[in-house]
UniProtKB/Swiss-Prot annotation:
<dbReference type="InterPro" id="IPR022847">
    <property type="entry name" value="Transl_elong_IF5A_arc"/>
</dbReference>
<dbReference type="InterPro" id="IPR020189">
    <property type="entry name" value="Transl_elong_IF5A_C"/>
</dbReference>
<dbReference type="GO" id="GO:0003743">
    <property type="term" value="F:translation initiation factor activity"/>
</dbReference>
<dbReference type="GO" id="GO:0045901">
    <property type="term" value="P:positive regulation of translational elongation"/>
</dbReference>
<feature type="modified residue" description="Hypusine">
    <location>
        <position position="38"/>
    </location>
</feature>
<comment type="similarity">
    <text>Belongs to the eIF-5A family.</text>
</comment>
<dbReference type="Pfam" id="PF01287">
    <property type="entry name" value="eIF-5a"/>
</dbReference>
<dbReference type="InterPro" id="IPR019769">
    <property type="entry name" value="Trans_elong_IF5A_hypusine_site"/>
</dbReference>
<dbReference type="GO" id="GO:0003746">
    <property type="term" value="F:translation elongation factor activity"/>
</dbReference>
<dbReference type="InterPro" id="IPR001884">
    <property type="entry name" value="IF5A-like"/>
</dbReference>
<dbReference type="GO" id="GO:0045905">
    <property type="term" value="P:positive regulation of translational termination"/>
</dbReference>
<dbReference type="GO" id="GO:0043022">
    <property type="term" value="F:ribosome binding"/>
</dbReference>
<dbReference type="InterPro" id="IPR012340">
    <property type="entry name" value="NA-bd_OB-fold"/>
</dbReference>
<dbReference type="GO" id="GO:0003723">
    <property type="term" value="F:RNA binding"/>
</dbReference>
<keyword id="KW-0648">Protein biosynthesis</keyword>
<dbReference type="InterPro" id="IPR014722">
    <property type="entry name" value="Rib_uL2_dom2"/>
</dbReference>
<keyword id="KW-0396">Initiation factor</keyword>
Length: 136
């Protein structure tokens, strides 16, 4: 799978940013560093939640280590059809059609009718609806 990532030093990360842990794009919810001891450099402890699976993951690395950060794109699509657990979307720039899981948020899922414009995020080859696109 061709995943768009960039290499970043651990010291450049902070809460709210994104990181790849176990090949899953995650949002950092906790970032703590321990001061360097007699031997070795400072270490960072990162707690992050998977963007697509919601699982909590922990990573401990030296602050000068390089880690992968996912390239996350936010795009606009139109709902083509409701297919039960999934909805078919059409990207408004490329006109590509694809299926995505319905969001777990019941209020958001109930608004997904054919013709509705939605905002979705794409990272690591996965897609997820993040909200309804308001009319401008």
């Amino acid at each position: 799978m061709d995943v768009a990532v960039k290499k970043v030093e651990v010291r450049q990360l902070k809460k709210g940013k994104y990181i790849m842990i176990d090949d899953e794009p995650c949002k950092i919810v906790e970032y703590t560093t321990s001061s360097p001891g007699k031997h070795g450099s400072a270490k960072a402890r990162i707690v992050a939640v998977g963007l697509f699976d919601g699982k909590k993951r922990t990573l401990t690395k030296p602050v000068d280590a390089k880690v992968d950060v996912p390239v996350i794109e936010r795009k606009t699509a139109q709902v083509v059809s409701d297919m039960g657990d999934t909805v078919q979307l059409m990207d408004m720039e490329t006109y590509e059609t694809f299926e995505v899981q319905k969001p777990e948020d019941e209020e958001l899922a109930s608004q997904l009718e054919p013709g509705t414009m939605v905002e979705y995020m794409e990272a690591a080859g996965k897609r997820k609806i993040v909200g309804i696109k308001e009319e401008e």
